[in-house]
Structures are given as C-alpha cells and as structure tokens.
Amino acid sequence: MGRSELELKTILITGASRGIGAEVATQLADRERHVIVNYREKTRRANDIVKAIRDSGGNASDARADLCDEGATAVMFDDIARLFGRLDVLVLNASGGLERGADPGYAMRINCDAQERLVRLALPLMPPGGRIVFVTSHQAHFLGRRPVPADYVPVAASKRAGEDALRAMGPILEANGISLVVVSGDMIDGTITVRLLEQRDPDAVAARRAVAPLPTVSEFARAIVRGIQEPVQDGQTIYVGGPDYLD
C-alpha cells in the first residue's frame, strides 16, 4: 500500500453490503476517501459494492465481521489499524432484531451492546476531528413519545438504548475531539425492515404511508452523507421524513 493511500480519509460503514449502508458507501465514492464495507455474510454483495466504488474512481475494501462477535470485531479494527493507521469516520448503520428466528436478546446485542463496543474499539484509531454517525429510526428515537408497531417494539427499545449509550459517552468523545451525529428516519421505503414489517403488520406500514411518502433509500443515504461531511453541532440529530414526528 502506497503512502498516498495511507493518507486517504478512512470511513468504516457497518452493514454496508446492501440497502442503506451500500447506498451510503457508493455515494461516498471519492479519490480522497477509502470506504470500508463491513458485512456479516453476503460476500458477493460486499464485493459488488467495493467494485462499484472502484469503478467510479473511488477507493474501497471489504471487512467481514459479525458485529456481535467480539473477537471478529477486534480483528476488524486491528486490520484497519494495520492497513490505514487510523479511522476518520465510523458509520453505525447495521442493525437487526426483526429477522425470523432471532432470539429475544439479539436485538439488544446488535443494536446496543455491539454499537457501544464498536465505538470503544474505534476510539484509539480516531484522530481529533473524527466523527461517529449513528443511524436510527423515528420509531426508536421517539420511543415513549409516539406509538410503535408491536412487532417493532424490541427493535425500537434496543436502538433507543444504543443511542442513549452513545450519548452517555459524550464526555469521552469530546475529550478525544470526536463528534457524534445521529441520523433518524421514518420507515425507509425499499429496506428489509419495511418488507419484514409489511409481512407482520401491514397496517402499521400503511399508516406511515398515509401520513407522507416514505423516504427512499437514496434520500436517507444522502442525509447520512451530510452527517458525515457537513459541519454539525456535536450530538445533533438529522431527521428524515415523518413530518408528524416533528410537530
């Protein structure tokens, strides 16, 4: 690896082999950045995203790691340290809990415990001016203030717990010169989350569509990219869709 590559801005996006994470990765394609596409098991999809970024003139690589596996995530960050020497941006996009057959504790492990662990692993690699972007949903962000579809409650509660855990790390992040941005969206059209909810509770999805058109994957990804690139106030939340949540 040449010295010029070591000087690129390095961005790790979790859950980036498909959906929102993949779209964020492709929107970030640039000669001045190196995008690391994290994925759990969809190797071909991750490779396709990396190839698309490279074909457009950007720089990218993949990093396979189950975020609930402490050993695998530690190895992933060791590899980032060895290959790039630092991590400028951590995008916490991966989440779960609606999958068929998921055990009752999985949502909390992936949406809260893993998120906090990733930040603690990333901190030693992040220079002052680095940024952490936490991706969530309005149903989680506004938990307790707005109704939540019954099937989504465990996910919403775990994602809210994850956001709270990261915000509680504010003094540590500030001491290291790291900013935290939260990007919250209504149900995002075309995502696996909405497809699973439509199977379990179609009325809940229809109710959200009745309020306003659901944001698309591309629209939501653009908001995440803004959260990465633009000057923002530390701890700021960027909202996408769901105008009734903001009344």
Predicted regions and their residues:
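Conserved glycine-rich cofactor-binding loop
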Residues: 17-19
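Rossmann-fold scaffold of SDR-type NAD(P)-dependent oxidoreductases
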Residues: 14, 87-95, 111, 134, ...
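C-terminal helical subdomain
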Residues: 178-183, 199-247
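Hydrophobic positions on the long internal alpha-helix
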Residues: 76, 91, 118-122, 126, ...
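Catalytic loop of short-chain dehydrogenase/reductase
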Residues: 95-101, 131-175, 187-189
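Conserved glycine-rich Rossmann-like NAD(P)H-binding loop of the short-chain dehydrogenase/reductase
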Residues: 31-48
